[in-house]
Structures are given as structure tokens and as C-alpha cells.
């Protein structure tokens, strides 16, 4: 009868709740600093530089669920679109709202980088990273890009820089009385400065000339930035039938032994 009772318990699949499990995973703090000047509407990347950059960055965010990630945008000015967070649903929703024209036009690379540094400098993470993406030359702001890089270095922040735009000229849309027209504009990216920012902070400079190369760049950064951290994961349900199964096996074994020894001689 005891074996039958235990079998009933097993079939009921008992579970425990409120359990914690320790695991090891990768996690760092990352701030994305993205140029949203009007030149990011150029269509050498599809559908344009900004949307291509948003798509690839969003995929990068989805691939790093345990990271604190924030978003800083810049043109002639800079502001924080989203502070560091592990709530990537909120981050991605705020990312969708990023468009040229929400701040004064221009390219303040130094200001954008300095803002990103201010958002990550107090982080206690083992690895602090900024991914700065721009398609132009610093022409606004009171902080020089190299000065901002020195500040980043002081706080132990590594900066990866990405220059986005094809070689030569790129088609740029503009509105006329006859609708949208396109004009080929020169692609001017201050690569020496972007390389210097990366070198100063221990990062790396990349050039993205199309969608595929931009995607590959983020993939490369993803591979380079892996830091093991300890994470406690909360599990609501945990199967507990194994101990009961062991008990059932033990009872059956005892019953078999009794049947072949003591109970064998009972008429």
C-alpha cells in the first residue's frame, strides 16, 4: 500500500517554488552613442544610414539580454534617450522614436562621447564600453572629440568607433515643389579622429560602407566584449518527483526481498 501511495504522489508531479539558481553568463555595461544628424538620412545604406544603424543595433541589443545598455544620441547637441538598463523592451521602444530633427542639426562628436561617458563612468561593471557611430566630421559642441576620449580613458571606458557611409558620394533625399529629389553628396568622415578616439581608449575603429559590413562590425564587437559574471536566476517551479521515485524504488526493492525471504515461509 505504501508503494501505491508513493506512486500516486509521483503521478501528481510535485513541484517546489521560490528557488534560486546560480549561473555564469556574459554581461557588461554598454552605451550606444549614435549620430542622428540629417546626413544620416543618406541612402548609401538601406533604407538609409540611420534606419540601418538602428536595425543592426537593435539586433545587437537583443543578443545581449544580461547587459546594462543605454542610448545617447547627438547632432549639434546631445541627450540621453535611455539610461543604462536591463529592460531592453523599454530601450528598444525608445530606440524606435529616434529620428533626425528632434535636436538641432550638426555633428558634435565630442559632446556625444562626453555625454555617453557621463552615463557610464560610475558603473561598477568589470567592463565599460561605448559604441560611437557617426557619418561625419565634428563641427559643433564645446568639447573636442579627443578631449572626450581622454575623459573616457580616465574612467576606464573603452570606445569602439564606427564611421558609416560609402566611399565617394552618397544619394541624399531632399524635398522640392515636385516631390522628393535626390542629390549625390560627398561622404566626409573624420576617420583620423575616430581612430584616435579608439586608440586612446583601447577600443577599435571600424568603417561600415554598407548594411552587411555594419552588421559584421557589431558582430565583431559582440565577440570581443564577453565578460563572465555570476547571476542568480529565480525559478518559480522545480520538479520534486525524483526523491519520491527513489523512495518508490526502495519500497519495491524491500517488498521483493521480503517476498523472497521472510514472507516466503508464511502460509
Q: Model-predicted segments: where are they?
A:
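C-terminal signal-anchor/stop-transfer transmembrane helix together with its immediate cytosolic
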Residues: 1-22, 227-267
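Residue-level signature of catalytic and energy-coupling elements of molecular machines
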Residues: 7, 91, 116, 159, ...
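Membrane-embedded segments
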Residues: 13-128, 143
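Juxtamembrane amphipathic/hinge helix adjacent to a transmembrane helix
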Residues: 29, 208-240
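Solvent-exposed loop/turn segments at secondary-structure junctions
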Residues: 38-39, 76-80, 102, 136-139, ...
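Soluble extramembrane regions of membrane proteins in the secretory/endomembrane system
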Residues: 83, 94, 111, 115-119, ...
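Short, hinge-like loop/turn segments at secondary-structure boundaries
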Residues: 87-90, 177-180, 223-226
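VWA/integrin I-like adhesion module and closely mimicked acidic/polar interface patches used
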Residues: 104, 129, 136-200
